[in-house]
Swiss-Prot record:
Positions bearing the site annotation: May play an important role in coenzyme binding: 71, 79, 97
Modes of activity regulation: Strongly inhibited by isoascorbic acid, 4-hydroxyacetophenone and 4-chloromercuriphenylsulphonate. Stimulated by various salts.
Assembly description: Homodimer.
Site (described: May play an important role for the adaptation of the alcohol substrate into the binding site): 176
Enzyme class name: oxidoreductase
InterPro entries: Gfo/Idh/MocA-like_OxRdtase_N (IPR000683), Gfo/Idh/MocA_domain (IPR050984), GFO_IDH_MocA-like_dom (IPR055170), NAD(P)-bd_dom_sf (IPR036291)
Family per similarity comment: Belongs to the Gfo/Idh/MocA family.
Organism this protein belongs to: Canis lupus familiaris
EC identifiers of the protein: 1.3.1.20, 1.1.1.179
MF GO annotations: D-xylose 1-dehydrogenase (NADP+) activity; nucleotide binding; trans-1,2-dihydrobenzene-1,2-diol dehydrogenase activity
Name used for this protein in its record: Trans-1,2-dihydrobenzene-1,2-diol dehydrogenase
Length: 335
């Protein structure tokens, strides 16, 4: 049976995800509805992607009995309301990262999903790329020995993009780019809670974080660090080092196709998406997370074993603590 998707928001990321679903077997994935706050945009999106239903409100999509799972592709500050709306209507939910602007928002969504017995997952698509799965397998086999340190960098000049510098929309580097770095460090260290977090950073003139460097100390004397920036070009690589060697995820580390493990270079081609155009780098790789959601739902799972809800809560806690350390608050923090 095909998994029936409803797309919440007709923006660029939603377009890429819908394009990807169209490359997968129709017997497994079908997009049955799209909603935008402007009906004309929803209709235009539906025409482009050949979707049977277009709604001018998220409420209408949530009420559509044909929708099994909702993909939330709105801006960060709108995630919570959209997720809670879809959960209240009995839908499974895949929500773009970051799930919430702060830890309180994430906890509220997680509690709602658990109380209703519904599937909820944060769309950290990176974790489903074969290059990352290969690294995880190597770590679990002890290929790198005892782990000591992990590091990640993600930075580009996004200051010309209004959303990236918009304080009201919780812009800045941490929530958009830093989450990729911290999820990598959290992944290689097994989702442990850091014992100590220290951060330094500069703010952009609008009040969002511009460039931030973070040091995380974990139990057992291991540590991770990352730098993220919306104004500086960084290496956009990630690595983990142990007593027997180093594993490197090459640029683009947030959607990687290359892994160097103890000097051995491995390539993992993207899934085929002939004649398809994407708005974001390696957009075809969204297929991996879509397949994972279907597998979880077919097994009757309420959360992903790869991105468990407790880890989504932990990532939100860490990001919030970093923001406090560098003095960045958003309007959503006072609600």
């Amino acid at each position: 049976m095909a998994l029936r998707w409803g797309i919440v928001s007709a923006g660029l990321i939603s377009s890429d995800f819908t394009t990807v679903l169209g490359t997968l077997p129709r017997s497994e994935h079908q997009v049955v509805a799209v909603a935008a706050r402007d009906l004309s945009r929803a209709k235009e999106f539906a025409r482009k992607h050949d979707i049977p239903k277009a709604y001018g409100s998220y409420e209408e999509l949530a009420k559509d009995p044909n929708v099994e799972v909702a993909y939330i592709g709105t801006q960060h500050p709108q995630h919570k309301a959209a997720v809670l709306l879809c959960l209240a209507a009995g839908k499974a939910v895949l929500c773009e990262k970051p799930m919430g602007v702060n830890a309180a928002e994430v906890r509220e969504m997680v509690a709602e999903a658990r109380s209703r017995g519904l599937f909820l997952m944060e769309a950290i698509w990176t974790r489903f790329f074969p290059a990352i799965e290969a690294l995880r397998a190597a770590l679990s086999q002890g290929t790198l020995g005892e782990l000591r340190v992990a590091r990640a960098e993600f930075g580009k000049n996004f200051t010309h993009i209004p959303r990236s510098v918009d304080w009201a929309q919780a812009g800045g580097g941490l929530l958009d780019l830093g989450i990729y770095c911290i999820q990598f460090i959290s992944m290689v260290f097994g989702g442990q809670k850091p014992e100590k977090i220290s951060a330094v950073g500069r703010r952009y003139e609008t009040g969002v974080d511009d460039t931030v460097t973070v040091l995380l100390q974990y139990p057992g004397g291991i540590h991770g660090s990352f730098t993220c920036s919306i104004s500086a070009q960084l290496s956009n690589m990630a690595f983990v080092s142990g007593t027997k060697g180093i594993g490197q995820i090459l640029d683009p580390c947030w959607c990687p196709t290359e892994l160097v493990l103890k000097g051995e270079h491995k390539e993992f081609p993207l899934p085929p998406a002939p004649s398809k155009e994407f708005n974001f780098t390696n957009g075809a790789g969204m297929a991996y997370e879509a397949k994972h959601v279907r597998e979880c739902l077919r097994k009757g799972l309420k959360e992903s074993p790869v991105i468990p809800l407790a880890e989504s809560e932990l990532l939100a806690d860490i990001l919030e603590e970093i923001r406090k350390a560098i003095g960045v608050t958003f309007p959503q923090d006072t609600r």
